Amino acid sequence: MIITFFALSRLGYTVMMLSTRLSAVACDFLLNIASCDTVLYGQSRSVRTIMGELLRLRPVACRPIVQRSSLDEAEKSSSVFVLNRAQRPENQVDKPGIILHSSGSTGLPKPLFVSHGSTAKSFTRGNELSTFNPLPWFHAHGLNSAMQAMYKRKTAFMWNASLPLTTNGLTKALEAAQPEFFTTVPYALQLLVDDPRGISALRKCKSVSYGGAPCPDELGDRLQSERIRVGGAFGL
């Protein structure tokens, strides 16, 4: 997915990131507003089911995302592909670079058009720390934190989307990655503070941040009492 995202952007396409939790009706609604006629999708059973339902709602070209095994088997080449852009970068600043969307918790999701200029500003303002964010890239908080780390040439650790978020799994991942900066949603922080090992792993981070939802007072007080350096991120 990561390679596909960068490849499409490099080729000049505006990429819309759809949540795997959306219904076919919600996907159809967003595709219509964005005038999108092609969908690249993952290989999980739930995603394939949604794609089948989507095809019954609208004619759209569907292409599976290239899997890692296919890339490993690809013929290696020392040649470098030079992309000649038809548009000058300065003329693209105000045009959409990425399309995200709201959760749709109160109805159909709303598209969020993010310009190239806004994207560049957001991606380049990182804190120069290795980062772990278990949120997927269709979540603005997950996308921004990963890109900010990459731009600063720091490691961006990500979660395996095929695995559920659990206290044990998240604690083990945090212990293995040992990031300087851990950022996620309050729900994941609650999972970690429920385990002494999770609290210990959070203490080792230089900074811990949450976004995407307000942090409950009880959780915030607990993090502070455990001497975890935590703060909130707003406006992503």
What kind of feature is each model-predicted range?
Residues L8, P96, S102-S105, T131, ...:
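Conserved S/T- and glycine-rich ATP-binding loop of Class I adenylate-forming
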Residues M1-F5, S9-L40, K110-F113, N133, ...:
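Short beta-strand->loop structural element characteristic of the AMP-binding/adenylate-forming
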